[in-house]
C-alpha cells in the first residue's frame, strides 16, 4: 500500500500537522494560492497597420462595431473571466508557483489518496478545488478534510471522516472574485478617462471608502458649539470631600451655553444651602462578553494592544498554524461542548466554585454566520501565554487576550453596589454617582474597558447638609463625530453586513493602498481624490455604492454557499444592472454620463501667462493649474503651483484637539463648511472649501506667512553642480535643484535613497513607430530601458529594444549600457533577442520571445561576459 499525500496552504501548518500523522502520509504545502485569474493581459494588441487593414472596406458603423468588439475581447482577455458567455474563466498558474505545482503533481501521481486539508472557509475550499483541478487524475482519489483547530485529536478525527469538496462554497468564492474583478477592470478605465489617470474602483472597497468620506464631510460640516459644566466641591459633616455635578435647574437638565449663563449659576450657587435630597443604593451586575469572533478580536486587539487589523490577522494565523488557537476567520460565537466542559473544570480548579455559573453561558451569533463552526479560543485552556514556544512577543500578547476572553466568557458576573446621591441647592440639583465592587467575577481574568465608575461616595443620608468649598465652572465645545479607526471601521462594516470575516483585513489594506484615504495616528482621513471618486461613483452607480445593496449581495453569496441559489444566475443579475449603469456612465455628461473632474477657478493669476489659475485635484493632491492648459498646443500653458499644507500637525488622540482645529479654520462663504488651508508662498495663503470641487468657495488670504526653512539632506545637481534639496510636490517627495534656471529633479526611491541621475533620451529617427508618425526614443525608467514614442504623451506607444538595434547604433548609447551591444542578438533558431529588465535583480538581461511569451532562451551578463541558458523544448 502506497502513501497518501496531504496538501495544506502553509509550511507552518504542514509542519504542525506532520507531527500528528503517521509515516503513511506525506504532508506538503501549496504556499497559498497556486492558480488565479491572469495578473495582466497576455496577448498583444494588433498593430495600427493590421487593424487598419482589417477595417479598410467596412462602413463607419461597422468600424465602430468592430472597434467595440475588439476592445471587449481585449478586456475579457485581461480580466480572465467572460461575463458575456457564461462566466468562463481563464485560470492560470501563478508566476513562481510552477515548481510547487510540478512537485505536487509528481507526488500525487504516486499517492494512493490525496487529502486536501486547506482552511475550512470559502477561500480554503477554493484553494482545494484549484489544487484538484491542476493536479488532475481520478477525482475519487481526492478527499477533503477540515478541522477547526490543529491539535492531535482534531486532526485524527478529521482524517477518520474525510468528506468531499464543497462546490457550493467554491462557487460562492468564485462569484465574489468575479464580481470584484468585473467592477475593478471595467470601472477603473472609466475613472481614468473621466476623472484622472491611475484611479481604481472596487465593489466592496469603494463602499468602505464612502463610509470614510461621509464621516470626513460630517466633521468638516460640524460647527462646534459652546457649553459649560459646573462642579461643586463640598464637605460632609465629618469633613469628607464630596464632588458633585450641577445637573438640573428647576427639574430640567441644565447645560449653560455661554459664560454669562455659567457665571449666573455660580453666583446663585455660592449663596445657596446644600442638602442631600435623595440617595439611591442598588445592586448591579456586569456580565462577561462573548468569546471573540474575527471582528471583535480585531477591535479588542486595536483598543487593548494597539495592533492594526493586518497585524492581528497575521499573528492569529501563526497561532492557529502552530496549533495554539482555533481558526481565526469566523463570525460564530459557538463553543464546542468539549471546550466548555474543559474550561468549566479549569475555572473550578483555579478560581473556585464562586466563579463558575450553574449553567454554561450561551451567546447568540448573527443569522447566517458564514463560518458557523466555533469562536476563536485557545486549543487547550491549560496552555497559557507563558507556555507558547517559537512565537514572538506580540503573538504572546494576542494569545493572552484570546485566552482571557475565552476564560472570562464562562465565568460569573461581576457584582457591584451602585449609588446615586442628589443634592438640592436653591433651584439647582447636583448629582454624584459611585460604584463599589463587591465580587470581581469575570473581571478577575479580563480587565473591563470603558469609563471607570468605581468610586466610593461618602456615607451621607437624606437631610444631611453639605458645606460648599468651591465651584469649578469649565468651558467646553461639542465634538465632531469621531474618526474611524481600523477597528471601528471593521465594526461599522460588520454592523451594516458589508464584507465577511475573511475579507475585513483585505478591505482595510486595499483602501489604504489605493491612496483614497490615509491613516494618521491610527485614525482615517479621507483624501480629496477619495471624495471626488466617491461622488462620481455614487452618482452613476447607485446600486454599487448602496450600503444595503452591498449587504444584500453578501447575503446572496451566503445563499450560494448554502446551495440555495445558482451562482451564475446571481452573477448574471448583477452584471445586467451593472453594465447598464456602466453604459450610461460612459456617455457625455449632458446625457447622464459621469461628470469630469471639475476645476474651480480663482482670481490668482498665472505667473507665466497671467491667465486665471484654477484649483485642480489629481490623484497626487490639490494644486493650482493655469486655465490656459486646455488651449491648442501652440498657445497652451502648463504652469502649475504646488500647494503646501499649512504648517501644524493635529494630534487627534488628544481630547478636543480636532474640535479646536475646526474652530480655527475659516468657514466657506458659500456653504459654511470648514476650509482647508494651503500656503502658495510666503505672501499668500489659499483657503479651499472642504467640499471642493462640489462647492467653488475659496478665499485668498494675503499677509506675511512663515515658510519653514530647509533642514534636510542635499546632493550635488548632476546638471549644473548646485545643491539639490528635498522638496514635497503633489507627486510626493523629490530632490529639486536650487538653481531656478536649472529645474533639474531626481526621484526619491521607496527605500529612501536618491535615484541615480536620469539619462537623457536617445533619439532613433531610423526606427518609426507603428501607430503614429513619430519615431522611437530610448528612455531609461524604473523598469529599465525601453523605446517610447518621440511625441509622448500624444502617442503612448512603447516596446522593448532589440539587441540588434542597439548594436546597429552602438555609438549613441551611454557608456553604462555599452555592454548590451556585446549580447547575443539571436537564439539558435534565429529569433531576435529582446532587452528586458529584472526588478528583482535590478539588472538587464536578454531573451527571445514567441507571441510575447519567453521562449526559454535567455542570457545574463556576469563578470564581464554573457552566460546563456537554453530551456526551450527543442533545444539541443
From Swiss-Prot:
Toprim domain boundaries: 3-150
GO annotation, cellular component aspect: chromosome
GO biological process: DNA topological change
Binding site for Mg(2+): 9, 119
Zinc finger (C4-type): 668-695, 717-742
Topo IA-type catalytic domain span: 166-582
Positions annotated as active site in the UniProt record: 327
Swiss-Prot/TrEMBL keywords: DNA-binding, Isomerase, Magnesium, Metal-binding, Repeat, Topoisomerase, Zinc, Zinc-finger
Residue stretches of biased makeup (Basic and acidic residues): 59-69
Gene Ontology terms, MF aspect: DNA binding; DNA topoisomerase type I (single strand cut, ATP-independent) activity; zinc ion binding
Region (Disordered): 37-69
Biased composition (Low complexity): 38-58
Cofactor (UniProt): Mg(2+)
EC code: 5.6.2.1
Region annotated Interaction with DNA, chain positions: 200-205
DNA-binding keyword on record: yes
HAMAP family: Topoisom_1_prok
Description of how the protein assembles with itself and partners: Monomer.
Entry similarity comment: Belongs to the type IA topoisomerase family.
NCBIfam families: topA_bact
Purpose of the protein: Releases the supercoiling and torsional tension of DNA, which is introduced during the DNA replication and transcription, by transiently cleaving and rejoining one strand of the DNA duplex. Introduces a single-strand break via transesterification at a target site in duplex DNA. The scissile phosphodiester is attacked by the catalytic tyrosine of the enzyme, resulting in the formation of a DNA-(5'-phosphotyrosyl)-enzyme intermediate and the expulsion of a 3'-OH DNA strand. The free DNA strand then undergoes passage around the unbroken strand, thus removing DNA supercoils.
Protein name: DNA topoisomerase 1
Organism encoding this protein: Vibrio cholerae serotype O1 (strain ATCC 39315 / El Tor Inaba N16961)
Gene name of this polypeptide: topA
Amino acid at each position: 500500500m502506497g502513501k497518501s499525500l496531504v496538501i495544506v496552504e502553509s509550511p507552518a501548518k504542514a509542519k504542525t500537522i506532520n507531527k500528528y500523522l503517521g509515516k503513511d502520509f506525506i504532508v506538503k504545502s501549496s504556499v497559498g494560492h497556486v492558480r488565479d485569474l491572469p495578473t495582466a493581459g497576455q496577448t498583444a494588441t494588433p498593430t495600427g497597420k493590421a487593424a487598419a487593414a482589417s477595417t479598410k472596406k467596412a462602413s463607419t458603423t461597422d468600424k465602430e462595431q468592430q472597434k467595440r468588439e475588439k476592445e471587449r475581447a481585449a478586456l475579457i482577455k485581461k480580466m480572465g473571466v467572460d461575463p458575456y458567455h457564461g462566466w468562463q474563466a481563464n485560470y492560470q498558474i501563478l508566476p513562481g508557483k510552477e515548481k510547487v505545482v510540478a512537485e505536487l503533481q509528481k507526488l500525487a501521481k504516486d499517492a494512493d489518496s490525496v487529502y486536501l486539508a486547506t482552511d475550512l472557509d470559502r477561500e480554503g475550499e477554493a484553494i482545494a478545488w484549484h489544487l484538484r483541478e491542476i493536479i488532475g487524475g481520478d477525482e475519487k482519489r481526492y478527499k477533503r478534510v477540515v478541522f477547526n483547530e490543529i491539535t492531535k485529536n482534531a486532526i485524527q478525527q478529521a482524517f477518520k471522516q474525510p468528506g468531499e469538496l464543497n462546490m457550493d462554497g467554491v462557487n460562492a468564492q468564485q462569484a465574489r472574485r468575479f464580481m470584484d474583478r468585473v467592477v475593478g477592470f471595467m470601472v477603473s478605465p472609466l475613472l481614468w478617462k473621466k476623472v484622472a489617470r491611475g484611479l481604481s474602483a472596487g465593489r466592496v472597497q469603494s463602499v468602505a471608502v464612502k463610509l470614510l468620506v461621509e464621516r470626513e464631510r460630517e466633521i468638516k460640516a460640524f460647527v462646534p458649539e459652546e457649553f459649560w459644566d459646573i462642579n461643586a466641591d463640598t464637605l460632609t459633616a465629618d469633613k469628607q470631600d464630596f464632588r458633585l455635578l450641577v445637573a438640573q435647574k428647576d427639574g430640567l437638565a441644565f447645560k449653560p451655553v455661554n459664560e454669562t449663563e455659567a457665571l449666573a449659576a455660580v453666583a446663585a450657587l455660592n449663596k445657596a444651602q446644600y442638602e442631600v435630597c435623595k440617595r439611591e443604593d442598588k445592586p448591579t451586575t456586569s456580565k462577561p462578553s462573548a468569546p471573540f469572533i474575527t471582528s471583535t478580536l480585531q477591535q479588542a486587539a486595536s483598543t487593548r494592544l494597539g495592533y492594526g487589523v493586518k497585524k492581528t490577522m497575521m499573528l492569529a494565523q501563526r497561532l492557529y498554524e502552530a496549533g495554539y488557537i482555533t481558526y481565526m476567520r469566523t463570525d460564530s460565537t459557538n463553543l464546542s461542548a468539549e471546550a466548555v466542559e474543559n474550561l468549566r473544570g479549569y475555572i473550578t480548579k483555579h478560581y473556585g466554585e464562586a466563579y463558575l455559573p450553574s449553567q454554561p453561558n450561551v451567546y447568540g451569533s448573527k443569522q447566517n454566520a458564514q463560518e458557523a463552526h466555533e469562536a476563536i479560543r485557545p486549543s487547550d485552556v491549560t496552555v497559557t501565554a507563558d507556555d507558547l514556544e517559537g512565537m514572538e512577543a506580540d503573538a504572546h500578547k494576542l494569545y493572552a487576550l484570546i485566552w482571557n476572553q475565552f476564560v472570562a466568557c464562562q465565568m460569573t458576573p461581576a457584582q457591584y453596589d451602585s449609588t446615586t446621591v442628589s443634592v438640592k441647592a436653591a433651584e439647582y440639583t447636583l448629582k454624584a454617582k459611585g460604584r463599589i465592587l463587591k465580587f470581581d467575577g469575570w473581571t478577575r481574568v479580563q480587565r473591563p474597558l470603558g469609563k471607570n465608575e468605581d468610586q466610593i461616595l461618602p456615607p451621607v443620608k437624606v437631610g444631611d447638609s453639605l458645606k460648599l468649598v468651591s465651584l469649578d465652572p469649565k468651558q467646553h465645545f461639542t465634538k465632531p463625530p469621531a474618526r474611524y479607526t481600523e477597528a471601528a471601521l471593521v465594526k461599522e462594516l460588520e454592523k451594516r453586513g458589508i464584507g465577511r470575516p475573511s475579507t475585513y483585513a483585505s478591505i482595510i489594506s486595499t483602501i489604504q493602498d489605493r491612496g483614497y484615504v490615509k491613516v494618521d495616528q491610527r485614525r482615517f482621513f479621507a483624501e480629496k481624490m477619495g471624495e471626488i471618486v466617491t461622488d462620481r461613483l455614487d452618482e452613476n452607480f447607485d446600486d454599487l455604492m448602496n450600503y444595503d445593496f452591498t449587504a444584500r449581495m453578501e447575503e446572496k453569496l451566503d445563499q450560494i454557499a448554502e446551495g440555495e441559489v445558482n451562482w451564475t444566475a446571481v452573477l448574471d443579475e448583477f452584471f445586467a444592472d451593472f453594465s447598464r449603469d456602466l453604459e450610461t456612465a460612459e456617455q457625455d455628461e449632458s446625457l447622464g454620463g459621469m461628470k469630469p473632474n471639475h476645476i474651480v477657478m480663482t482670481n490668482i493669476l498665472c505667473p507665466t501667462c497671467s491667465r486665471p489659475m484654477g484649483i485642480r485635484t489629481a490623484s497626487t493632491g490639490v494644486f493650482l493649474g493655469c486655465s490656459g492648459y486646455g488651449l491648442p498646443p501652440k498657445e497652451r500653458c502648463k504652469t502649475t503651483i504646488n500647494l503646501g499644507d499649512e504648517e501644524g500637525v493635529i494630534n487627534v488622540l488628544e481630547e478636543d484637539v480636532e474640535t479646536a482645529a475646526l474652530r480655527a479654520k475659516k468657514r466657506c462663504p458659500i456653504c459654511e463648511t470648514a476650509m482647508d488651508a494651503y500656503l502658495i508662498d510666503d505672501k499668500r495663503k489659499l483657503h479651499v472649501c472642504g467640499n471642493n470641487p462640489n462647492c467653488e468657495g475659496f478665499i485668498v488670504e494675503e499677509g506675511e506667512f512663515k515658510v519653514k526653512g530647509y533642514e534636510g539632506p542635499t546632493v550635488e545637481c548632476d546638471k549644473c553642480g548646485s545643491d539639490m534639496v528635498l522638496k514635497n510636490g503633489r507627486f510626493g517627495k523629490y530632490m529639486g535643484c536650487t538653481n531656478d534656471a536649472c529645474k533639474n529633479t531626481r526621484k526619491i526611491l521607496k527605500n529612501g535613497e536618491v535615484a541615480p541621475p536620469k539619462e537623457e533620451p536617445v533619439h532613433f529617427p531610423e526606427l518609426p513607430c507603428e501607430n503614429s508618425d513619430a519615431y522611437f526614443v530610448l528612455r531609461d525608467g524604473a523598469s529599465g530601458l525601453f523605446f517610447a514614442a518621440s511625441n509622448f504623451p500624444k502617442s503612448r506607444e512603447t516596446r522593448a529594444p532589440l539587441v540588434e538595434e542597439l548594436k546597429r547604433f552602438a555609438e549613441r548609447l551611454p557608456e553604462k549600457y555599452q555592454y548590451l551591444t556585446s549580447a547575443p542578438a539571436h537564439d539558435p533558431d534565429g529569433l531576435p533577442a529582446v532587452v528586458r529588465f529584472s526588478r528583482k535583480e535590478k539588472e538587464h538581461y536578454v531573451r527571445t520571445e514567441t507571441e510575447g511569451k519567453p521562449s526559454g532562451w535567455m542570457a545574463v551578463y556576469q563578470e564581464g561576459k554573457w552566460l546563456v541558458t537554453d530551456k526551450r523544448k527543442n533545444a539541443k
